[in-house]
């Protein structure tokens, strides 16, 4: 049975809502207890894609509040708290207990609560005489957001900026690495697996992998081993492979335009936590949810947009035919057939029963069709207005050819599109072109200025490419470059060639992404010059024998792929396609520090440009985070 992160996290949440009691086979508690749920903003975002109000009601939650809102006492009712272990949350809990807001307090922290906070909680509740109110304290290890069965985010915003900030010192970098490794640890605890870890040598990926390896080793030696429950999985199947990369491994895929439905909805309509709003011609915006409960989204989110439009039309026509068929059978339309029986005849009664059963299904189908018609209409309007299809094609051609005709380049920059569309296109030109023509670059900059685009991100990529070319030349004989705190090295690490030496070299003939191709090679477990230098870490093996590639045992049927500095729906889709066409790996879970669209990643590049003095003041730039 394949790993399913959404299912595992949902099970943990349900158990928490039922006061951490064992559940019966139906997924509910043996004894129903009505309770109140208190959460912070972060944990609200964890719950949002997993549960709806009806699910909370099913598990006895009658009221739910944000922890930072003023609340009235509700006596004789237990309260379930689900919050991050922060100083402010801790003080609020102590204050709530001292006021006896609720009968009992069941405290659930999204990650492991530090010992000093635990002592502070004990001291605070003792001082106020409310210690008996605290029934239980649990570390839930749920500090991540699951968006689909195989997609998660640590919801750690602006990690790319923080990791690549030229002013960041060793202390700041180590704090970021700690946060990322702790988030990944939560994911592995929830899945109940201890993976084999692979990553490029040098750079953020190796730092996270090494720290995570140590965390897992320490935990496996502790008395309260959280991975014993996963033993059944491990005895039946091979352990999964965890592949860790950082965004600079393949920067282009995070910036480029894409014409497939899921990335397009995320990029153009701002899909967040599986929800989006679409402005119609009249009235307020309509809110929609897109997740695995939507059959059309599940079946068609990987298709190119024109194919989605055709599929919507097909589904609508099928719906109309089915409605007409129902009308015929019930005498509601012309040419109705009653099979020679009267209204109370057995056959017609059966027709009526079948019709009644089919009505809810037809109604639900119509809702789904209407939803995607609204979304597709909004997308089409933006595609036409911004020429997104043209940007997508030109960027793809640039990546394959390693450049673009100057006339075509300038026409795109002076044509339709938002400032951000043109900025992304210009950065893709920089990344994909092996030999930069100075006069051409100046013409691109002039076109961006004419469009009144903030060129900080463009200047940043140009500067780094220039610095990196000389940096690579002076260290060409270096077998390993691992001084992460040096900012230029910190930015590129092992992945220099992936960003600046012509990304077309990393693409196979079918335009397979570099990450996908690398994961495919890693899961096969065969000798391969492209990955032979990758670190191999096995937390279950003796430390002395854990670093060499000779210990790799492939192939791997399960993989977890993690991107530091921001993932995207393009990579996610590519990795899911890998499981469909490749014989080895059957299931891939994809995660990232946050899920970003192209504009959001370029905003982070722009902020780095400003920090390097390549644009306006840093304070003038605000980031709209991913999820």
Swiss-Prot record:
Q: Keywords of this protein's UniProt record, alphabetized? A: Protein transport, Transport
A single GO cellular-component term on record: mitochondrion
The keyword Transport is annotated on this UniProt entry: yes
Positions of the UniProt region annotated as Disordered = 526-551
Q: What InterPro entries does this protein's entry cite?
A: Sec-1-like_dom1, Sec-1-like_dom3a, Sec1-like, Sec1-like_dom2, Sec1-like_sf
Q: Name one GO biological process term.
A: protein transport
- SUPFAM superfamilies given in the database record: Sec1/munc18-like (SM) proteins
Origin superkingdom? Eukaryota
Quote the biased-composition stretches of kind Basic and acidic residues, using this chain's numbering: 527-541
Q: Which family does it belong to?
A: Belongs to the STXBP/unc-18/SEC1 family.
Q: What does this protein do?
A: May be involved in the early secretory pathway.
Q: Which PANTHER family match?
A: VESICLE PROTEIN SORTING-ASSOCIATED (PTHR11679)
- The entry's protein name is SEC1 family transport protein SLY1
Native species: Arabidopsis thaliana (Mouse-ear cress)
